[in-house]
Amino acid sequence: MADSVGNPDARPDLELEEEFGSEDEGTLTERQRHGGARSMGFRPGGGEAAQAYEAKTGIKAPRIIAWEITRSCNLSCAHCRAAAEFGAYAGELSLEQIKATVDDIVSITNPIFILTGGEPLMRPDIWEIVDYVHDKGGMPVIGTNATLITDEIAAQMAAHRIPRISVSIDFPTAVEHDGFRGQPGCFDATVEGIGIAKRHGVGVQVNMTVTTMNADKVEEVHDLAEQLGVDAFHIFMLVPTGRGEDLLDKELPPEEYEAVLEWAYERQKTSPLHFKPTDAPHYYRIIRQKAKAEGKKVTREEYGLDAMTRGCLGGITFAFISHVGDVQPCGYFDMQLGNVKEQPFSEIWTESRVFNELRDYSLLKGKCGACEYKAVCGGCRARALSVTGDYLAEEPYCVYVPASMRGECEE
C-alpha cells in the first residue's frame, strides 16, 4: 500500500490528515523548518479562488485532497484501507477525467494534492498528473511505499517539483516489517528508496501505523526515521477498514491508545523531526490538557502547527477521492458521498448532507457532543462509522469523560 494522509499510506494518510499535513492556514514555521510544500511558499487554500468560495458559501474550501490515483499496488499490506493488490482495476479515472476534476477543484481552492494508492508510481501517466496539478496552481505530493524508487524515478520527482513523499515503516526490522507488508525484501527496498529520494533533494515523511503488534516499537521506528535523515515522522492509529478489518483484534485498546498519544506529546518536545500522531484527534485534547497542567498557552510559537489545527478534518478542510472517483471525507470513511464522473467535486463538497453534518459540531452525539474539546478534537468520524454505523456517534476509542458528564465546570 502506498502512504497516507486520508489513509496512512494515502493519508499523509497519506491521507499525508491525511499530511503531509492536517493543518489549517497561517502556519509556516514548522513547514519551513522541516521542508515540504509550505517551505516552497505554498499556502493551501489561501488563494483567491478559495477566498471567493468561502465568502460566497460560508464553507471552508478544502486545503488537502488525498487522491487515490490507482488502486494497483506491488505490496499486500495487512492493514491496507484500500485492500489493494497488484494488477489493473476496472473503472479507474482516466487522465482526462483527472484533469477535468483538477480543473473543477482549482475553481474553488488551491490545495495540496496527496497522490496516493495503491502505489501511485505504478500509474504510467503520474508525471502528467503532477505537472497538470502544478500548472493549475495546486501542490502535488506523493504517498508511496518507496520500493519502486530508483535514481531515475527520484530524478523525475525532483524534476517535476515533488517537495515531499510519505513512506510507511511499521517495524524497525526487516523480518517484522516484511511480514506486515506482505512482501519479503520490502523493508530494505523501502529504506533504499528513502535514501535515493533524499539524495535527489526530495523531502521524506515516515508514517507508522500503530497496532498491538508494534506499539512497543514506536520509539525504535522513530529513531530509525531519524537515522535515515527524514523530515517528519507521523504515527497513524489504525482505523479498521478495508483489509484492516482483519486486524480488529490488533487495534489498541482505548487505554493503550491514550498512553501512546501521551508518550507522543512528550517525545515531540525533543524530537528533531516534525512529529505528530494522525487519525488520532484525541491528541489535540491531550495537548490542551498537558499545556494547562504545565502552565502553558497553546500558541503557534509554543506548539507550531498543532496549535493551528484540529483533530478530525474530514469534510472540513480535507477530502478523499478514490481510484474510481468516489468522494469521501477521508480514505477510512467508508461512505460514498458522490462521484466526480457524475457530479463535480465542488458541488459534492458544497451540497453533500454528510459533509455539512460533519462541519456542524453541535450534531455530535454522546460524549463527543458533550465534550468541551469537541472543537479541537471531534473524535474520529470514520472510526465511529466503522464501529457503530453512525458517523456522528461518540468516538469509541476515547477514554476521556467530559467535564459536563463529571458534574464539573468546563475547562
Task: Give the positions of each predicted feature.
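Cysteine-cluster motifs in flexible loop/terminal segments that predominantly coordinate metals
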Residues: L364-E410
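A structural motif corresponding to the C-terminal lobe/cap of the Radical SAM core domain
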Residues: Q227, D231, D246-L273, M308-T309, ...
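Conserved alpha-helical substructure of the radical SAM core
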Residues: A2-D13, E17, R31-R164
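Short, small/polar residue-rich loop motifs at catalytic or cofactor-binding pockets
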Residues: C312-I316
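Short, acidic, Ser/Thr-enriched surface-loop or helix-capping motifs
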Residues: Q227, I321-S322
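C-terminal accessory region of radical SAM enzymes
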Residues: G201, E255-E301, D326-G378
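Radical SAM/AdoMet-radical enzyme domain recognition
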Residues: L95-T116, M122-P253
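Short, basic/aromatic recognition patches
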Residues: V298-R310
